[in-house]
Amino acid sequence: MDAMSLSFERTQSVAIIGGGPGGYEAALAAAQLGAEVTLVERAGVGGSAVITDVVPSKSLIATADAAVAISEASDLGVQLFAKSDSGKPLKPEVAINLAAVNKRLLSLARQQSDDMRAQLVEAGVRLIAGHGRLDGSHGVVVSTGPDGTDFDRIEADTLVVSVGASPRELPAAQPDGERILTWTQLYDMKALPAHLIVVGSGVTGAEFASAYMNLGAAVTLISSRDQVLPGEDKDAAAVIEKVFKRGGMTVLSKSRAEKVERSGDGVVVTLSDGREVAGSHCLMAVGSVPNTAGIGLEEAGVQLTESGHIQVNRVARTSVPHIYAAGDCTTFVPLASVASMQGRMAVFHALGDTVIPLERSRITANIF
C-alpha cells in the first residue's frame, strides 16, 4: 500500500518541443496541474504564429483597414485638409511608410512573445533555447550551441510535439528574401511594392493580397482554381472576389504558376499556358509543410501521414500513448486556436484530468 501511495505522489514530468500556441498552452496547463515542465523552443516563445504569422499579419491587415478608412472618410462627411502657403485648403494623400509599419508589427510580435515567456517563467516552466528532437520514446535531445554541437538531454513521462509548419517552397520559385518572398519574409520590405504578384489564393494569399491592395500597391492574384478561397463557401468567395476586382486587383483564375524568376529589379511569373506576368515582387502562398522531418518521430514509433503530418486522435494523442502533438504539424485543422486547445487537452489527458475530445464540426474559423 505504501509503495502504491508513493507512485501516485510522484511528480509527473512533461517535455514539450515547440513554443507556439500549442506548446505554450500545454506548458501552462501542465505547470498548473503540478507537473515538472520543460519547453524547448528555437525561435522564441509564441512560435511562428506570434513572431512571423498571425500577430504581424493581422496587425498589417488592421493597418491596411485604417488606410482605407482614412481614404474613404469623406464619404462619411469627414474631410481632412491642409493649408497651402496661399491659405487655400489642400486635400492630403494617404502615404504608407512600410518600413515604419513593419517595424511596429514586428515590435508588437516581439512584445507578445516576451510576455508569453514571462508567463511561462512565472509558472515555473523550464525553458531551453535550441533545436529539439526525440531520442527514443521518452527522451528529448536539444542542440543548444550555435553550431549544433552542444547538447542537452531531457527525460519525461509525457512528450508533446508542437513544432509547427513552414511555408512550402517550390523548386521553380525559390524565395530569395528580396523579390521572391514567403509570407515570413514580407516584413523585411522597406517600401510598398509597386506591383505585388501573389501566387496562391487560399486564406494566406487572399489576406495578403487584400492588405497590400488596401495599402496602395498594385496587386495581381494568381489562382489555380475557379475562384479565390477554394474550399470556402462559394457564395462568400464570389463576393470577396468581386470586392478584390472593384478595388483594382487583377485576379487570374484557372491559372497555374509554373515558375518565378528574377528579372532585373522585378520578377516574372510564367503560367502553365505560357503567359507571363511581370511585377516588382512575388509572394509565394502555396501552403505549408510540417516541421517534422529529422526530429526522431518515426524512430520513436510516431505515425506520420504521407505529407509528414503527425497522426493524432481527438485528444491530440499520437500512435505512441505517452506522446502527444498539437498545432500545424498535426492532421487537425491548422489554426492557432485549435493548437491551443490541443495543447491543453494533451496534458489534461496525459495527467488524468477530464477532457472533452475535439470535434471538427464545431471548429470555427475566420478570414480577415
Residue ranges of each PLM-predicted region?
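Beta1/beta-strand and adjacent pyrophosphate-binding region of the FAD-binding site
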Residues: 6-20, 192-202
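Conserved phosphate-binding and hydrolysis motifs of nucleotide-dependent enzymes
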Residues: 18-23, 164, 200-205, 287, ...
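Glycine-rich dinucleotide-binding loop and its adjacent helix/turn
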Residues: 54, 161-218, 222, 298-300, ...
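FAD-site-proximal beta/loop scaffold in flavoenzymes
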Residues: 177-192, 276, 281-357
